Amino acid sequence: MLLFVEIDILDQSGGNKMSKKKSKRNNKSKNQKLIAKTSKTGEDIIVVHTEKLKKKYYEKELQKLQIELVKLQRWIKAKGLKVVVIFEGRDAAGKGGVIKRITQSLNPRICRIVALGVPTEKEKTQWYFQRYIAHLPAEGEMVLFDRSWYNRAGVEYVMGFCTQDEYREFLRSCPEFERMLIRSGIILIKYWFSVSDEEQEKRFQERIQNRVKRWKISEMDLESRKRWVDYSKAKDTMFAHTDIKQAPWYVVNADDKRRARLNCISHLLSLIPYKDIEPEKIKLPPKLQKSGYIRPPVTDQTIIPEKY
């Protein structure tokens, strides 16, 4: 069974759950209950909200969640936990955006992002999972995979980068591989960011028009756009084989970026029980006396221009 990530409906003006009375009174403008529809291709149920999440409210809630992520990280380090979080989904679904918000306030020495490129010629000859194993966490670490070994079930299969035998072997061995990781003590969490074809097209167009984001779109993205249904079928097959009890797929409705980020982070925090460990108090040592030190003339140094 696929699990959909949800969060309590909050009143954006105050951050508290809406009362039934208030909800009825402001049903049209405030009620964020879900409206379900199918995408054009019919393979996904897309959740539509009646109102966009306000930026001020979003930033306030995000800050709260990021404080909790810091607490979680301290707990992971103190207890020697090993956490792997996989982020999968279509191009422009928002995987990188949520990863960025998760890691913004975390120690990069403890929380690492892994986004592997095309395998080298040597890696192509290795056991398929081998190049991912090198990036698994040690005790006290959390690793976020921006795409993962599931490339084989998606892009590699659809684009013909692997053989049918390699594809079938992946579907057969992946659940056992993940169970092995879990038995070794790794906490494995898997998210699928679900975006509608209409929203993906909108984001692609934005990337094409925006010079700052232009690098985000590639020829492979454009080709995958042509094969939407093929990717949908591949996703369905992947879920059927790898949505296991020990490591289920959690589906995030990603058509609204802000909601997707808050929902995903909130859900992630709910999956790992943690307590707030008060950090050791830090006291700055007294400032040392100059003890005869004389700074060299500034003219001996190369100073960058003060343009701002």
Regions found by a protein language model. Give the residues of each.
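Glycine-rich phosphate-binding loop of ATP-dependent small-molecule kinases
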Residues: 8-9, 14-308
